[in-house]
From Swiss-Prot:
GO cellular component, one term: small ribosomal subunit
Family of the protein in this entry: Belongs to the universal ribosomal protein uS4 family.
PANTHER family from the UniProt entry: 30S 40S RIBOSOMAL PROTEIN (PTHR11831), SMALL RIBOSOMAL SUBUNIT PROTEIN US4M (PTHR11831:SF4)
Coiled coil: none
Gene: rpsD
Domain S4 RNA-binding: 98-159
Organism: Pelobacter propionicus (strain DSM 2379 / NBRC 103807 / OttBd1)
Protein name from the UniProt record: Small ribosomal subunit protein uS4
NCBIfam families listed in its UniProt record: PRK05327.1 (NF003717), rpsD_bact (TIGR01017)
Length: 208
């Protein structure tokens, strides 16, 4: 499946909730879901009742879009989560949260996950002192993510760091704003994921 390149706001309207795909805009009255709270398209205002399968599919699509993944990537994460000990749905969320691009976003270096993914790809960060450019790297407890010296004057990054208080930093992460770095204090647990996600629906879908 090719990566979606259309308007991000259409995805929020499709899932009938804010996915926070456009950074600061999502916190303002300009957010599309606040102005047009119905699906996109000619017949969008006539919402239909979904079947059990349809509900599961929509939940999977919602989670996939929140983290900006293609179907094959997402299915791979589910397969890995299913092999791990513990609850599959919670394992899945933990794997998604520990992606490097998501950690960069959670620490406040970017206003959206798509922006954080681009920053990582362009080599603006180091992981444990080594330059990295792979957004999907799985971070571990004790890992240190630091903004490279040459990137510390980028306006968008500083604006995002100044605004992070509005979103908050999860308890499993720690940010040193003055040093432009953060670290993983612990593994994320289910309670750390505050986005309304029903991961069990995803498990049920892939278990068919």
């Amino acid at each position: 499946m090719a990566r979606y390149t259309g308007p991000s706001c259409r995805l929020c309207r499709r899932e009938n909730m804010e996915l926070f795909l456009k950074g600061d805009r999502c916190y303002t009255d300009k957010c599309a879901i606040k102005r047009r709270n119905y699906p996109p398209g000619q017949h969008g205002q006539g919402r239909t009742k979904n079947s059990a399968y349809g509900i599961q599919l929509r939940e999977k699509q919602k989670v996939r879009r929140i983290y900006g993944l293609m179907e094959n990537q997402f299915r791979g994460y589910f397969a890995e989560a299913d092999r791990m000990k513990g609850v599959t749905g919670e394992n899945l969320l933990s794997l998604l949260e520990r992606r490097l691009d998501n950690v960069v976003y959670r620490l406040g270096f970017a206003s959206s996950r798509s922006e954080s993914r681009q920053l990582v790809r362009h080599g603006h960060f180091t992981l444990n002192g080594k330059k990295v450019d792979i957004p999907s790297i799985q971070t571990r407890v004790g890992d240190v993510i630091e903004l490279r010296e040459k990137s510390r004057k980028i306006v968008s990054i500083n604006d995002a760091l100044d605004a992070v208080a509005r979103r908050g930093i999860p308890q499993w992460l720690e940010l040193d704003r003055d040093a432009f770095k953060g670290n993983l204090k612990a593994l994320p647990v289910r309670e750390d994921v505050t986005t309304p996600i029903q991961e069990q629906l995803v498990v049920e879908l892939y278990s068919k």
